[in-house]
A protein has these predicted regions:
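Membrane-anchoring hydrophobic segments
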Residues: 1-74
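Aromatic-anchored segments of alpha-helical transmembrane domains
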Residues: 10-17, 73-85, 143-148
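Alpha-helical transmembrane segments of polytopic membrane proteins
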Residues: 30-49, 95-109, 134-136, 162
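Intrinsically disordered, low-complexity, charge-biased linker/tail regions
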Residues: 64, 76-77, 108-113, 213-228
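Internal/C-terminal transmembrane anchor helices
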Residues: 129-155
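Soluble catalytic regions of membrane-associated enzymes that act on cell-envelope
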Residues: 152-230
Length: 230
């Protein structure tokens, strides 16, 4: 039960707090902007589905004792697939290696796990001390959490772009300008978002050079597909 609660907490916080903008971008791309994204509901529903997936995996493999937490491996793989998103998410022919990699890895895990269950049946039935049981499963869960964080989107500039885009779409132009305002890094896309927000606020002449302008006049416009391929 504690492992279940810890996984639920990690999944919800990771999706709702750290990868919220990535989930929104993925939703916008898949739904073509026709439905409204609900971040909290999405994080809760996904977490619930992942818990059900874990239950199904453990029902199939019967993982016990010190390796019980390994039943969360497919759930963590799904988290990686959902959050390993790059700038190509908005391209009409967007595709990701996770489309074939995720089912392949899950099938491999289930196959190997099913085989190992038969080989180590005696060891699995011997749970040992409670302290050792808890420590072993916590170590597995922590390792899976770290791997998931490393596998998800960690590009700070990309997150800034997505956050600015969210506020721009909502018409909250002041908030667009506060995204990454203390950072000296600024991608061309973020620079263009700031220019649009300043234009809408009628403050471009006053505040344009309050932000880094690494792209000169090109920073006022978004990159075209041909420019991205150079």
């Amino acid at each position: 039960l504690p492992i279940c609660l810890l996984f639920s907490l990690f999944s919800f916080v990771y999706l709702y707090v750290f990868q919220r903008d990535v989930l929104e971008a993925l939703h916008f791309s898949l739904a073509h902007g026709k439905t409204t994204f609900a971040p909290m509901a999405s994080a809760l529903v996904i977490t619930l589905i992942l818990l059900l997936l874990r239950w199904g995996v453990n029902s199939l493999l019967g993982l016990k004792g010190r390796v019980r937490a390994l039943a969360y491996v497919p759930s963590f793989l799904v988290l990686c697939a959902l959050t390993d998103v790059g700038r190509g998410v908005y391209i009409s022919d967007y595709h990701t290696p996770w489309t074939w990699l995720l089912p392949l890895l899950v099938l491999l895990f289930v196959g190997i796990g099913y085989w190992l269950r038969g080989v180590f049946r005696v060891q699995l039935n011997h749970e040992g001390s409670l302290w050792g049981l808890v420590n072993s499963n916590l170590a597995i869960l922590l390792g899976l959490c770290l791997l998931t964080v490393c596998g998800g989107s960690t590009n700070r500039q990309f997150h800034h772009e997505l956050e600015a885009e969210h506020y721009l779409r909502a018409g909250e132009y002041d908030k667009v300008l506060r995204v990454g305002e203390k950072s000296l890094e600024a991608s061309r896309t973020l620079t263009a978002y700031r220019a649009v927000a300043l234009s809408r606020l009628g403050k471009m002449g006053d505040r344009l050079f309050a932000y880094p302008q690494y792209y000169r006049s090109d920073g006022l416009f978004f990159e075209t597909r041909s420019e991205e391929r150079r």
